[in-house]
UniProtKB/Swiss-Prot annotation:
Domain of life: Eukaryota
Name the record gives this protein: 5'-nucleotidase
Gene Ontology terms: biological process: AMP catabolic process
Enzyme class, UniProt record, top EC level: hydrolase
Sorted UniProt keywords: Cell membrane, Disulfide bond, Glycoprotein, GPI-anchor, Hydrolase, Lipoprotein, Membrane, Metal-binding, Nucleotide-binding, Signal, Zinc
Organism: Bos taurus
Disulfide cross-links: 51-57, 353-358, 365-387, 476-479
Length: 574
């Protein structure tokens, strides 16, 4: 008997079964996501400043609520996630200190949130109460570990991961936070921020042992780290990120943001999987919208979508809008108090102030120096002539088209952190190190790029990090007619700067370690508001304080940098 003939009926039965019982259809999940909202509860102008022309304004939680409700009604499996930095950025946070964040995130029905660095701006106590105690959804971070007496106090208020039931399936969400947070905010000494990848892997492994085969990494470390997590952490299927305010889009973008890549950005993991990575810019301007199909083993089959521009074509939810109006009453005193006027656009955007000289930086530095005009004598016109200011400390522009009016509310959006402008004495060699640090990772939109007053600096970005300052001149003080002279490495200079930098923030450890003398100064917002009131009408310009040499092949443009990167990627993969 031919053995093959005996197997033929069985094979036919199996083939028939395959036709009658086809493979299970992929399971589809819709991921809605926000990041870096920074207290933009109300709609804003297109550049995230105060709304001037309502027909052209964007975002706000009332408009976000409308779109989220529409999608939840239309689609069966939806998660609403936030990748951190809800705290800080407008008068809302200055007054309510996070209570507003918890209230409106609860109202929108968020499913999970990762901790961002700015959630620690009011210290751990300002995170615990109100946010951690008042939200009714999980707050996540796998790489933050508490120690000492704080460990028991904060236990159970945040988690490394959470398993969510979505329809008939379960989805694991694992959180992470920038390990640079101690340099960027005020988490104190009893929280340890571990390496993201090292901390995430064991938590993902735990989820796998619990038979969770669909895992989203939700976190706040920036696009470059997001991509590394997608590549290195085995078992992560999707990465939803924040911190770098990255705009990704497939097709023609709907507003002025230039995409840093397609949405989703696909990373090939070390074990050969295609992992979608997404962010949704910042300030509540967009709602990230990603549809992912999983097979029965939890593998990503397809992923597609795009951020949704929350413009005026989307109506504001009337119930949320009414709630906003109730909360707004407490802010009206700040909104109506006029400090002065501007007849030019005050450019405080990250696209400018983290890449090149911006006139908002010039205005703030001029105010800092003006606030320290004292002690003239026969030898010196003033005791200090220099200011440095981290570009990341400038958080919003001010639009001159609103009759040019500048209010406390406007200024609180520009300078929301509540620090002081301090006076330090530094050697010229320390200043040189600080300016090298300012551009050591130029092009990544990081906050350490310095705005200046009383200083002329020229960079050559084509040179290696640590050797990019080609010219550094400072305004003399011991002179009757101020002029610029070369920085002397061995001379001691007085410099006005934010208290954040004095304490080593944004990686300026050399200032913290090498300062010769330190005197605390006045509250930042009081310094600038006083200057505006004194000047009455403002028109700060871009004056050439910060320049890039021809060898840099760089003009400090955020858009051109991203276009250059995209061009390189296209060339490499042609």
């Amino acid at each position: 008997m031919n053995p093959g003939a005996a197997r033929t009926p069985a094979l036919r039965i199996l083939a028939l079964g395959a036709l009658l019982w086809p493979a299970a259809r992929p399971w589809e999940l819709t991921i809605l996501h926000t990041n870096d909202v920074h207290s933009r509860l109300e709609q804003t102008s297109e550049d995230s400043s105060k709304c001037v022309n309502a027909s052209r304004c964007v975002g706000g939680v009332a408009r976000l609520a409308t779109k989220v409700h529409q999608i939840r009604r239309a689609e069966p499996h939806v998660l609403l996630l936030d990748a951190g930095d809800q705290y800080q950025g407008t008068i809302w946070f200055t007054v309510y200190k996070g209570t507003e964040v918890a209230h409106f995130m609860n109202a929108l029905g968020y499913d999970a949130m990762a901790l961002g660095n700015h959630e620690f701006d009011n210290g751990v106590e300002g995170l615990i109460d109100p946010l951690l105690k008042e939200v009714n959804f999980p707050i996540l971070s796998a790489n933050i570990k508490a120690k000492g007496p704080l460990a028991s106090k904060i236990s159970g208020l945040y988690s490394p991961y959470k398993i969510l039931t979505v329809g008939d399936e379960v989805v694991g969400i694992v959180g992470y936070t920038s390990k640079e947070t101690p340099f960027l905010s005020n988490p104190g000494t009893n929280l340890v921020f571990e390496d993201e990848i090292t901390a995430l892997q064991p938590e993902v492994d735990k989820l796998k042992t619990l038979n969770v085969n669909k895992i989203i990494a939700l976190g706040h470390s920036g696009f470059e780290v997001d991509k590394l997590i997608a590549q290195k952490v085995k078992g992560v299927d999707v990465v939803v990120g924040g911190h770098s305010n990255t705009f990704l889009y497939t097709g023609n973008p709907p507003s002025k943001e230039v995409p840093a890549g397609q949405y989703p950005f696909i990373v090939t993991s070390d074990d050969g999987r295609k992992v979608p990575v997404v962010q949704a810019y910042a300030f509540g301007k967009y709602l990230g919208y990603l549809k992912v199909e999983f097979d029965e083993k939890g593998n990503v089959v397809t992923s597609h979508g795009n951020p949704i521009l929350l413009n005026s074509s989307i109506p504001e939810d009337p119930n949320i809008k009414a709630d906003i109006n109730k909360w707004r009453v407490k802010l009206d005193n700040y909104s109506t108090q006029e400090l002065g006027k501007t007849i030019v656009y005050l450019d405080g955007t990250a696209q400018s102030c983290r890449f090149r000289e911006c006139n908002m930086g010039n205005l703030i530095c001029d105010a800092m120096i003006n606030n320290n005009l004292r002690h003239p004598d026969e030898m010196s016109w003033n005791h200090v002539s220099m200011c440095i200011l981290n570009g990341g400390g400038i958080r919003s522009p001010i639009d001159e088209r609103n009759n040019g009016t500048i209010t406390w509310e406007n200024l609180a959006a520009v300078l929301p952190f509540g620090g002081t402008f301090d006076l330090v004495q530094l050697k010229g060699s320390t200043l040189k190190k600080a300016f090298e640090h300012s551009v050591h990772r130029y092009g990544q939109a990081t906050g350490e790029f310095l705005q200046v007053g009383g200083i002329h600096v020229v960079y050559d970005i084509s040179r290696n990090p640590g050797d990019r300052v080609v010219k550094l001149e400072v305004l003399c003080t011991q002179c009757r007619v101020p002029s610029y002279e070369p920085l002397r490495m061995d001379k001691v200079y007085k410099v006005i700067l934010p208290s954040f930098l004095v304490s080593g923030g944004d990686g300026f450890q050399m200032i913290k370690d090498e300062k010769i003398k330190h005197d605390s100064g006045d509250q930042d917002i009081n310094v600038v508001s006083g200057y505006i009131s004194k000047m009455k009408v403002l028109y700060p310009a871009v004056e050439g304080r910060i320049q890039f040499s021809a060898g840099s092949h760089c003009c400090g443009s955020f858009s051109l940098i991203f276009l250059s990167v995209l061009a390189v990627i296209i060339i490499l993969y042609q």
